[in-house]
Amino acid sequence: MLLLPPRPPHPRSSSPEAMDPPPPKAPPFPKAEGPSSTPSSAAGPRPPRLGRHLLIDANGVPYTYTVQLEEEPRGPPQREAPPGEPGPRKGYSCPECARVFASPLRLQSHRVSHSDLKPFTCGACGKAFKRSSHLSRHRATHRARAGPPHTCPLCPRRFQDAAELAQHVRLH
């Protein structure tokens, strides 16, 4: 069941004297200056969000009804700080260690450190890692023991990449 706001009774007479004047229109909110049309906290408080509904009364006469909508909070829910304590840090906190991160993606990346899953495995020695960047760093240790594979035919220098060797040979 839909409940509508009360509407004053519609006069039976259609004479101009008997009709109610139309409700005054709310002035439009000023647009924010600058490249963005969204108001910022530096420009002052935001105008209230209004929901306008076109309704029809019992006699079939349309009228508008305006309500102020509640602002939805942005970001994670905020906790209240005890008196005398600094306010809560804004962000997303880790449920394991309570570290706070600015974005949910950073939190998700951090939570890998608490898991026992190690999906990245070294093909040379079988050692496993939680992050691909750690595996890449580890692979360099295998290359360091063997030394760079590309040796200059004109001098004792060695290079990891064949393109670097070719550039070096041109300098001779």
From Swiss-Prot:
* Annotated PROSITE patterns: ZINC_FINGER_C2H2_1, ZINC_FINGER_C2H2_2
A GO CC term attached to the entry:
nucleoplasm
Keyword terms, alphabetized? Chemotaxis, DNA-binding, Inflammatory response, Isopeptide bond, Metal-binding, Nucleus, Repeat, Transcription, Transcription regulation, Ubl conjugation, Zinc, Zinc-finger
Which superkingdom heads the taxonomic lineage of this protein's source? Answer: Eukaryota
Q: Where is the composition biased (Pro residues)?
A: 19-30, 75-86
Tell me what induces its expression.
Up-regulated in presence of reactive oxygen species (ROS), like H(2)O(2), through the NF-kappaB signaling pathway. Up-regulated by sphingosine-1-phosphate (SP1) through the p38 MAPK signaling pathway (at protein level).
- Swiss-Prot/TrEMBL puts the cross-link Glycyl lysine isopeptide (Lys-Gly) (interchain with G-Cter in SUMO2) at 31, 118
What is this protein's tissue specificity according to the annotation? Answer: Expressed in endothelial cells.
Alphabetical GO biological process terms: cellular response to hydrogen peroxide; chemotaxis; inflammatory response; positive regulation of endothelial cell migration; positive regulation of endothelial cell proliferation; positive regulation of gene expression; positive regulation of interleukin-8 production; positive regulation of leukocyte chemotaxis
Query: Does this UniProt record's set of keywords contain DNA-binding?
Result: yes
Q: Which Pfam families match?
A: zf-C2H2
Report which residue ranges the record marks as coiled coil. none
Q: Where is this region: Disordered?
A: 1-93
| Compartment(s) of residence | Nucleus
> Which residues fall in a compositionally biased region of kind Low complexity?
31-44
* Zinc finger regions, C2H2-type: 92-114, 120-142, 150-172
Q: Which GO terms describe its molecular function?
A: DNA-binding transcription activator activity, RNA polymerase II-specific; DNA-binding transcription factor activity, RNA polymerase II-specific; RNA polymerase II cis-regulatory region sequence-specific DNA binding; sequence-specific double-stranded DNA binding; zinc ion binding
Chief location of this protein?
nucleus
> What job does the chain carry out?
Involved in the regulation of endothelial cell proliferation and migration. Mediates H(2)O(2)-induced leukocyte chemotaxis by elevating interleukin-8 production and may play a role in inflammation. May be involved in transcriptional regulation.
- The protein's assembly and partners: Interacts with SMAD2.
Descriptive protein name: Zinc finger protein 580
Annotated organism of origin: Homo sapiens
Its ancestry begins with: Eukaryota, Metazoa, Chordata, Craniata, Vertebrata
